Regions:
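Conserved glycine-rich acetyl-CoA-binding loop
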Residues: 104, 108-122, 130-131, 142-149, ...
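A beta-strand edge to alpha-helix "cap/lid" segment located at domain peripheries
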Residues: 94-95, 116, 162
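A short beta-loop-alpha structural element at the N-terminal edge
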Residues: 4-18, 30
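Acetyl-CoA-dependent GNAT
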Residues: 18, 22-110, 121-123, 127, ...
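Flexible, glycine-rich phosphate/dinucleotide-binding loops
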Residues: 14, 84-89, 145, 165
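C-terminal "cap" of GNAT-fold acetyltransferases
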Residues: 134-137, 141-148, 152-181
Length: 181
């Protein structure tokens, strides 16, 4: 596999934006992401610039890790957010211990199945463990079977925590975690 796995640099915001827009056009994007393509497209460049700075190499609270092909094209990504004990997460739940939270998982369809997602997850977990987190979690839509199978394959287990999705009581997301080794 001739792919480079690395953290983004702050000046690579345009590539991060482009990959995000591709991800939001995926057939299961409505299950995988809270943001829509139209919403993301309407964001000003400054939004993506700030997002890149906050998750670039050297950032302390988040890290966006990408898979870069031999031609320089970004073909996959995952972002790790650090959540500190004593805070409240995006869904309004109390964070009881220092943890990582994986978001924005995406690999282009043409390179799925060759192990890139596993390598991206390994890099994300390594970054999180290096910051002293006790566990890493993610939230997955209950109907996103493909993602749930993959997360289980790489060691994430359901916690039983259910996150209601927006104003629709019929749709839920499930928390899955991997504990620090």
């Amino acid at each position: 596999m001739n792919y480079k796995i690395r953290s983004i640099r702050a000046d690579e915001w345009a590539a991060a934006k482009e990959l995000r827009l591709v991800a939001l056009q995926d057939p299961v994007a409505h299950l995988a992401f809270l943001e829509t393509y139209d919403t993301a497209l309407a964001q000003p460049d400054s939004f993506y610039q700030e997002r890149a700075v906050g998750a670039a190499e050297g950032a302390e609270k988040a890290q966006q890790i990408i898979a870069e092909g031999p031609d320089g094209e970004w073909v996959g990504t995952v972002t790790v957010l650090l959540e500190e004990a004593g805070t409240v997460d995006w869904a309004g739940f109390a964070v009881e211990r220092k943890q990582g939270h994986l978001v924005g998982v995406f690999v282009r369809p043409e390179v799925r199945g060759i192990g890139l997602t596993e390598v991206l997850f390994d890099a994300a977990l390594e970054w999180a463990w290096g910051r002293g987190v006790e566990r890493v979690r993610l939230i997955v839509h209950e109907d996103n079977e493909r993602a749930r199978r993959f997360y289980g394959k790489v060691g994430f287990v359901p916690t039983g925590v259910v996150v209601p999705l927006g104003g629709n009581a019929d749709e839920r997301e499930l928390e899955m975690v991997v504990e620090r080794p």
